[in-house]
């Protein structure tokens, strides 16, 4: 429980810090605002991806496994919650489907031994490609 609280608190503190420093935090792709904000946005996205990986692929599956739930359920719950979170943020059904599928795939990779840092890098790359280049 402490790991999740720390990860979520860290993400919230960083987001608040960026806002207080005047860094634009926007759902708009980088081409829609000053080029200087791109680096700040990439750093923020990296921190968010890391926090999401800690929670959705680290803490949550581990806690569900501790409850002796079936393996399919310990994978389905975090994947559906992750997809639902991303749908709630922008209401995009395509994003819901992609996020849920990616979450399930990352959980599979995690079970096969992938580290959370590796998954956070993959998550960041996914966000940058799909969100900023494609605009989903």
What residues fall within each predicted segment?
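Juxtamembrane helix-loop-helix connectors linking adjacent transmembrane helices
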Residues: 1-49, 66-67
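Hydrophobic alpha-helical transmembrane segments
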Residues: 1-5, 38-42, 72-77, 96-97, ...
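Small-polar-interrupted transmembrane alpha-helices in polytopic inner-membrane proteins
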Residues: 7-11, 72-86, 103
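Membrane-embedded alpha-helical segments of multi-pass membrane proteins
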Residues: 35-39, 43, 51, 55, ...
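Alpha-helical transmembrane segments of multipass membrane proteins
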Residues: 46, 80-87, 104-108, 128
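Active-site His/Glu-centered metal-binding helix of metallohydrolases
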Residues: 50-55, 59-60, 84, 88, ...
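Membrane-interface helix/loop boundary segments of multi-pass membrane proteins
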Residues: 52-77, 108-115
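Functionally important transmembrane alpha-helices
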Residues: 91-136
